[in-house]
């Protein structure tokens, strides 16, 4: 006769004068429960861990959480943690830490692991980008804002030659990734607790499109042309393109840019917050939460 697994109280059923006990999940050995947990998603594991002490102990097994981490998690973790910290952390705690945004490179970049896909997410501050003319305060300035992960955005008041670029290299977990620029027309601030947008410098973005571009070290390329016509004071994510990673053991280098270098007219009134690199499957969800 087959055994039924149940989380409730023990039950006995009469069947042809033979009593058969229904097996409860709590009756299983701790190592069996841990094996079952490897088949569950992290939120489900955490819910089970709250049921009793045995489940809580089982949920801390290293092999459970190592199966939820990317295969190359050590490379990713070394970006944000030193060797001593990594040695002390059990895999459950390491997963918890990597699932939250972690700043690195002097606070100009942030990475985390997406809980649904186990893939890498990256955010790169405007301060880590190459911006032509950024040191000339007649054109550019870094403005404080609590609407940025990095508490700062680059603002161009007016310029003829608009050119912003950057690059990054790491061993990405396998999968397809999307790259976005997070930008806003106008400059927002707060007055008497209310959010207001200064749009007086917005001009030139409707004359010629901005060219967004990315290229990878394995010769993948993407180009898109977009007029910047989103509503002033509203952050928008402009999709540059996608790239695929098939070998997580090899570093993938990415170069990206947004340019508008037609010098027949000026353009201005634009905030650049960051560049986002996200697993394609969860990009909409992550962007929607910002």
From Swiss-Prot:
It is found in: Nucleus. The keyword Oxidoreductase does not apply. GO terms for biological process: protein ubiquitination. Keywords: Nucleus, Ubl conjugation pathway. Pathway: Protein modification; protein ubiquitination. The keyword Membrane does not apply. InterPro entries: F-box-like_dom_sf, F-box_dom, PP2-like. It holds the Pfam family F-box. One of its GO terms (cellular component) is nucleus. It comes from the Eukaryota. Residues 21-67 form the F-box domain. CDD domains: F-box_AtSKIP3-like. Part of a SCF (ASK-cullin-F-box) protein ligase complex. Interacts with SKP1A/ASK1, SKP1B/ASK2, ASK5, ASK11 and ASK13. The F-box is necessary for the interaction with ASK proteins. Component of SCF(ASK-cullin-F-box) E3 ubiquitin ligase complexes, which may mediate the ubiquitination and subsequent proteasomal degradation of target proteins. This is F-box protein PP2-A13.
């Amino acid at each position: 006769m087959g055994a039924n697994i149940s989380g409730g109280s023990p039950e006995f059923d009469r069947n042809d004068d033979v009593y058969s006990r229904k097996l409860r999940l709590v009756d299983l050995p701790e190592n069996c429960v841990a094996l079952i947990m490897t088949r569950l998603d992290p939120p489900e594991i955490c819910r089970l861990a709250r049921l009793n002490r045995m489940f809580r102990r089982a949920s801390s097994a290293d092999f459970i959480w190592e199966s939820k981490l990317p295969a190359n998690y050590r490379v990713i973790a070394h970006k944000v943690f030193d060797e001593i910290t990594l040695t002390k952390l059990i895999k459950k705690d390491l997963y918890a830490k990597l699932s939250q945004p972690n700043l690195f490179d002097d606070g100009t970049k942030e990475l985390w692991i997406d809980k649904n896909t186990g893939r890498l997410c990256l955010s790169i501050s405007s301060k880590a980008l190459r911006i032509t003319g950024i040191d000339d305060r007649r054109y550019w300035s870094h403005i404080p804002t609590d609407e940025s992960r990095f508490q700062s955005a680059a603002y161009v008041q007016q310029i003829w030659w608009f050119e912003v670029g950057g690059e990054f290299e790491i061993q990405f977990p396998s999968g397809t990734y999307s790259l976005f620029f997070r930008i806003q027309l106008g400059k927002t601030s707060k007055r008497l607790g209310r959010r207001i947008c200064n749009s007086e410098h917005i001009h030139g973005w409707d004359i010629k499109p901005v060219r967004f571009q990315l290229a990878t070290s394995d010769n993948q390329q993407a180009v898109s042309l977009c007029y910047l016509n989103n509503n002033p004071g509203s952050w928008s994510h402009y999709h540059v393109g996608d790239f695929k990673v098939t070998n997580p053991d090899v570093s993938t280098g990415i170069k990206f840019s947004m340019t508008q270098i037609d010098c027949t007219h000026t353009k201005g009134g634009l905030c650049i917050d960051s560049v986002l690199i996200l697993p394609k499957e969860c990009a909409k969800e992550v962007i929607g939460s910002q």
